[in-house]
Curated annotation (Swiss-Prot):
It is a single-pass membrane protein. Belongs to the NqrC family. Its main location: membrane. It is an enzyme of class 7 (translocase). NQR complex catalyzes the reduction of ubiquinone-1 to ubiquinol by two successive reactions, coupled with the transport of Na(+) ions from the cytoplasm to the periplasm. NqrA to NqrE are probably involved in the second step, the conversion of ubisemiquinone to ubiquinol. It is found in: Cell inner membrane. This is Na(+)-translocating NADH-quinone reductase subunit C. The keyword Cell cycle does not apply. Its cofactor is FMN. One of its GO terms (cellular component) is plasma membrane. Keywords: Cell inner membrane, Cell membrane, Flavoprotein, FMN, Ion transport, Membrane, NAD, Phosphoprotein, Sodium, Sodium transport, Translocase, Transmembrane, Transmembrane helix, Transport, Ubiquinone. One of its GO terms (molecular function) is FMN binding. NCBIfam families: nqrC, PRK05346.1-1, PRK05346.1-5. It comes from Vibrio anguillarum (Listonella anguillarum).
Amino acid sequence: MASNNDSIKKTLFVVIALSLVCSIIVSTAAVGLRDKQKVNAVLDKQSKIVEVAGINESGSVPELFAKYIEPRLIDFKTGNFVDGDATAYDQRKASKDPAQSIKLTAEQDKAKIIRRANTGVVYLVKSGDEISKVIVPVHGNGLWSMMYAFVAVETDGNTVSGITYYEQGETPGLGGEVENPSWRAQFVGKKLFDDNHQPAIKVVKGGAPAGSEHGVDGLSGATLTSNGVQHTFDFWLGDMGFGPFLAKVRDGGLN
Protein backbone atom coordinates (compact mmCIF):
# COMPACT_ATOMS: atom_id res chain seq x y z
CA MET A 1 0.00 0.00 0.00
CA ALA A 2 2.81 2.36 0.95
CA SER A 3 4.55 1.49 -2.31
CA ASN A 4 1.45 2.47 -4.31
CA ASN A 5 1.22 5.79 -2.43
CA ASP A 6 4.88 6.51 -3.14
CA SER A 7 4.30 5.74 -6.81
CA ILE A 8 1.32 8.11 -6.99
CA LYS A 9 3.31 10.86 -5.24
CA LYS A 10 6.19 10.44 -7.67
CA THR A 11 3.82 10.57 -10.63
CA LEU A 12 2.16 13.73 -9.32
CA PHE A 13 5.55 15.30 -8.69
CA VAL A 14 6.68 14.56 -12.24
CA VAL A 15 3.44 15.94 -13.72
CA ILE A 16 3.64 19.12 -11.64
CA ALA A 17 7.32 19.58 -12.40
CA LEU A 18 6.75 19.14 -16.13
CA SER A 19 3.83 21.58 -16.03
CA LEU A 20 5.98 24.20 -14.31
CA VAL A 21 8.82 23.73 -16.78
CA CYS A 22 6.44 23.96 -19.74
CA SER A 23 4.81 27.09 -18.29
CA ILE A 24 8.20 28.75 -17.90
CA ILE A 25 9.19 27.83 -21.45
CA VAL A 26 5.91 29.12 -22.91
CA SER A 27 6.07 32.35 -20.86
CA THR A 28 9.66 33.00 -21.89
CA ALA A 29 8.83 32.34 -25.54
CA ALA A 30 5.81 34.65 -25.37
CA VAL A 31 7.86 37.49 -23.87
CA GLY A 32 10.56 36.98 -26.49
CA LEU A 33 7.95 36.98 -29.27
CA ARG A 34 6.36 40.19 -27.98
CA ASP A 35 9.75 41.88 -27.86
CA LYS A 36 10.52 40.73 -31.41
CA GLN A 37 7.12 41.95 -32.62
CA LYS A 38 7.76 45.38 -31.08
CA VAL A 39 11.17 45.60 -32.76
CA ASN A 40 9.67 44.56 -36.10
CA ALA A 41 6.86 47.12 -35.75
CA VAL A 42 9.37 49.92 -35.14
CA LEU A 43 11.51 48.75 -38.06
CA ASP A 44 8.49 48.59 -40.39
CA LYS A 45 7.42 52.09 -39.37
CA GLN A 46 10.92 53.46 -39.93
CA SER A 47 11.03 51.73 -43.31
CA LYS A 48 7.80 53.44 -44.40
CA ILE A 49 9.09 56.83 -43.23
CA VAL A 50 12.37 56.38 -45.13
CA GLU A 51 10.38 55.31 -48.20
CA VAL A 52 7.97 58.26 -48.19
CA ALA A 53 10.89 60.62 -47.55
CA GLY A 54 12.28 59.54 -50.91
CA ILE A 55 15.60 58.32 -49.53
CA ASN A 56 17.10 55.95 -52.09
CA GLU A 57 20.56 55.61 -50.60
CA SER A 58 21.83 52.13 -49.82
CA GLY A 59 22.08 51.14 -46.17
CA SER A 60 20.04 49.56 -43.43
CA VAL A 61 16.75 51.15 -42.44
CA PRO A 62 17.92 52.07 -38.90
CA GLU A 63 21.07 53.69 -40.33
CA LEU A 64 19.18 55.71 -42.93
CA PHE A 65 16.53 56.72 -40.41
CA ALA A 66 19.17 57.93 -37.94
CA LYS A 67 21.06 59.80 -40.67
CA TYR A 68 18.19 61.60 -42.39
CA ILE A 69 15.13 61.63 -40.13
CA GLU A 70 14.63 63.75 -37.03
CA PRO A 71 11.45 63.04 -35.03
CA ARG A 72 10.09 66.09 -33.19
CA LEU A 73 7.13 66.74 -30.93
CA ILE A 74 4.63 69.51 -31.61
CA ASP A 75 1.75 71.06 -29.71
CA PHE A 76 -1.31 70.56 -31.92
CA LYS A 77 -3.00 73.68 -30.57
CA THR A 78 -0.19 76.09 -31.44
CA GLY A 79 1.79 74.16 -34.04
CA ASN A 80 4.97 74.90 -32.09
CA PHE A 81 7.73 72.40 -31.38
CA VAL A 82 7.82 71.21 -27.77
CA ASP A 83 10.52 69.52 -25.74
CA GLY A 84 10.46 65.78 -25.18
CA ASP A 85 11.72 62.47 -26.49
CA ALA A 86 9.85 62.06 -29.76
CA THR A 87 11.36 58.62 -30.33
CA ALA A 88 9.90 57.26 -27.10
CA TYR A 89 6.56 59.08 -27.36
CA ASP A 90 3.55 56.90 -28.23
CA GLN A 91 0.94 59.18 -29.78
CA ARG A 92 -1.59 56.38 -30.16
CA LYS A 93 -1.32 55.53 -26.46
CA ALA A 94 -1.45 59.21 -25.48
CA SER A 95 -4.68 59.69 -27.43
CA LYS A 96 -6.39 57.17 -25.14
CA ASP A 97 -5.26 58.96 -21.97
CA PRO A 98 -7.69 61.75 -20.91
CA ALA A 99 -4.77 63.56 -19.25
CA GLN A 100 -2.88 63.70 -22.56
CA SER A 101 -5.70 64.10 -25.06
CA ILE A 102 -9.06 65.65 -25.84
CA LYS A 103 -12.35 64.02 -26.79
CA LEU A 104 -13.51 65.40 -30.11
CA THR A 105 -17.04 66.63 -30.67
CA ALA A 106 -19.10 65.10 -33.47
CA GLU A 107 -18.52 68.24 -35.53
CA GLN A 108 -14.76 68.16 -34.97
CA ASP A 109 -14.32 64.43 -35.47
CA LYS A 110 -14.37 64.29 -39.26
CA ALA A 111 -11.97 61.33 -39.35
CA LYS A 112 -13.92 59.35 -36.71
CA ILE A 113 -10.90 58.96 -34.40
CA ILE A 114 -12.85 59.85 -31.20
CA ARG A 115 -9.86 61.34 -29.34
CA ARG A 116 -6.79 63.33 -30.37
CA ALA A 117 -3.56 63.54 -28.39
CA ASN A 118 -2.49 67.02 -27.28
CA THR A 119 1.01 66.39 -28.59
CA GLY A 120 1.92 64.96 -31.98
CA VAL A 121 5.01 63.63 -33.72
CA VAL A 122 6.37 64.98 -36.99
CA TYR A 123 9.42 63.78 -38.87
CA LEU A 124 11.88 66.27 -40.34
CA VAL A 125 13.82 65.06 -43.37
CA LYS A 126 17.36 66.43 -43.24
CA SER A 127 19.46 67.45 -46.23
CA GLY A 128 22.81 68.54 -44.89
CA ASP A 129 22.18 71.31 -42.36
CA GLU A 130 18.73 72.09 -43.71
CA ILE A 131 15.30 70.49 -43.66
CA SER A 132 14.12 69.34 -47.09
CA LYS A 133 10.69 67.92 -46.19
CA VAL A 134 8.38 67.23 -43.29
CA ILE A 135 6.43 64.02 -42.75
CA VAL A 136 3.16 64.07 -40.84
CA PRO A 137 1.40 60.92 -39.60
CA VAL A 138 -2.36 60.85 -40.19
CA HIS A 139 -5.11 58.36 -39.51
CA GLY A 140 -8.81 58.05 -40.07
CA ASN A 141 -11.58 55.48 -40.13
CA GLY A 142 -12.28 53.60 -43.38
CA LEU A 143 -14.96 51.00 -44.04
CA TRP A 144 -13.52 48.24 -41.84
CA SER A 145 -10.51 49.71 -40.10
CA MET A 146 -8.55 52.66 -38.85
CA MET A 147 -6.15 53.60 -41.65
CA TYR A 148 -2.71 54.97 -40.75
CA ALA A 149 -0.50 56.82 -43.22
CA PHE A 150 2.52 59.09 -43.54
CA VAL A 151 2.28 62.17 -45.76
CA ALA A 152 5.50 63.84 -46.92
CA VAL A 153 5.24 67.58 -47.56
CA GLU A 154 7.69 70.00 -49.17
CA THR A 155 9.01 72.91 -47.11
CA ASP A 156 6.37 75.20 -48.61
CA GLY A 157 4.01 73.43 -46.21
CA ASN A 158 1.65 72.76 -49.10
CA THR A 159 3.01 70.44 -51.80
CA VAL A 160 2.74 66.68 -51.33
CA SER A 161 5.89 64.75 -52.19
CA GLY A 162 4.58 61.32 -51.17
CA ILE A 163 2.13 59.27 -49.15
CA THR A 164 2.25 55.74 -47.82
CA TYR A 165 -0.21 53.72 -45.76
CA TYR A 166 1.49 51.57 -43.13
CA GLU A 167 -1.49 50.03 -41.33
CA GLN A 168 -5.00 49.33 -42.59
CA GLY A 169 -7.53 46.50 -42.75
CA GLU A 170 -9.65 47.44 -45.75
CA THR A 171 -10.96 44.93 -48.31
CA PRO A 172 -8.12 43.53 -50.46
CA GLY A 173 -8.44 44.65 -54.08
CA LEU A 174 -10.92 47.40 -53.16
CA GLY A 175 -10.30 49.68 -50.18
CA GLY A 176 -6.99 47.93 -49.60
CA GLU A 177 -5.77 49.65 -52.78
CA VAL A 178 -4.81 52.62 -50.60
CA GLU A 179 -1.46 50.82 -50.53
CA ASN A 180 -1.25 50.55 -54.33
CA PRO A 181 1.78 52.59 -55.53
CA SER A 182 -0.08 53.73 -58.66
CA TRP A 183 -2.94 55.17 -56.62
CA ARG A 184 -0.59 56.79 -54.10
CA ALA A 185 1.46 58.35 -56.91
CA GLN A 186 -1.50 60.62 -57.74
CA PHE A 187 -0.85 62.62 -54.58
CA VAL A 188 2.65 63.69 -55.60
CA GLY A 189 2.64 67.38 -56.52
CA LYS A 190 -0.89 68.01 -55.22
CA LYS A 191 -1.52 71.08 -53.08
CA LEU A 192 -2.90 70.46 -49.61
CA PHE A 193 -4.43 73.93 -49.24
CA ASP A 194 -6.25 76.43 -51.43
CA ASP A 195 -5.34 80.11 -51.81
CA ASN A 196 -7.11 80.88 -48.53
CA HIS A 197 -5.03 78.22 -46.72
CA GLN A 198 -8.04 75.95 -46.23
CA PRO A 199 -7.77 72.14 -46.61
CA ALA A 200 -8.31 71.41 -50.29
CA ILE A 201 -7.43 67.78 -51.09
CA LYS A 202 -10.39 66.13 -52.83
CA VAL A 203 -10.83 62.38 -53.36
CA VAL A 204 -13.16 62.37 -56.36
CA LYS A 205 -15.52 59.49 -57.12
CA GLY A 206 -15.30 58.69 -60.82
CA GLY A 207 -11.98 60.47 -61.22
CA ALA A 208 -10.50 63.89 -60.59
CA PRO A 209 -10.40 66.42 -63.46
CA ALA A 210 -7.18 66.34 -65.45
CA GLY A 211 -4.64 68.82 -64.15
CA SER A 212 -6.45 69.34 -60.84
CA GLU A 213 -4.19 70.90 -58.20
CA HIS A 214 -6.05 69.25 -55.36
CA GLY A 215 -7.96 66.26 -56.75
CA VAL A 216 -7.13 62.55 -56.81
CA ASP A 217 -9.20 59.66 -58.14
CA GLY A 218 -11.38 57.81 -55.68
CA LEU A 219 -10.83 54.09 -55.24
CA SER A 220 -12.92 52.03 -57.66
CA GLY A 221 -15.59 50.03 -55.83
CA ALA A 222 -14.53 51.43 -52.45
CA THR A 223 -16.59 54.55 -51.90
CA LEU A 224 -16.60 54.33 -48.11
CA THR A 225 -12.85 53.82 -47.93
CA SER A 226 -12.39 56.78 -50.30
CA ASN A 227 -14.63 58.83 -48.03
CA GLY A 228 -12.43 57.79 -45.12
CA VAL A 229 -9.34 59.07 -46.93
CA GLN A 230 -11.15 62.34 -47.65
CA HIS A 231 -12.20 62.77 -44.04
CA THR A 232 -8.69 61.93 -42.86
CA PHE A 233 -7.26 64.82 -44.88
CA ASP A 234 -10.11 67.13 -43.88
CA PHE A 235 -9.34 66.58 -40.20
CA TRP A 236 -5.54 66.47 -40.14
CA LEU A 237 -5.10 69.49 -42.40
CA GLY A 238 -7.48 71.52 -40.25
CA ASP A 239 -7.05 73.52 -37.07
CA MET A 240 -7.46 70.42 -34.88
CA GLY A 241 -4.70 68.59 -36.74
CA PHE A 242 -1.49 69.70 -38.43
CA GLY A 243 -2.98 72.91 -39.85
CA PRO A 244 -1.24 75.24 -37.35
CA PHE A 245 2.09 73.40 -37.74
CA LEU A 246 1.99 73.42 -41.55
CA ALA A 247 1.14 77.14 -41.46
CA LYS A 248 4.40 77.72 -39.59
CA VAL A 249 6.24 75.55 -42.12
CA ARG A 250 4.70 77.63 -44.91
CA ASP A 251 5.94 80.80 -43.22
CA GLY A 252 9.51 79.50 -43.10
CA GLY A 253 9.55 78.16 -39.58
CA LEU A 254 11.81 75.18 -40.29
CA ASN A 255 15.18 76.50 -41.51
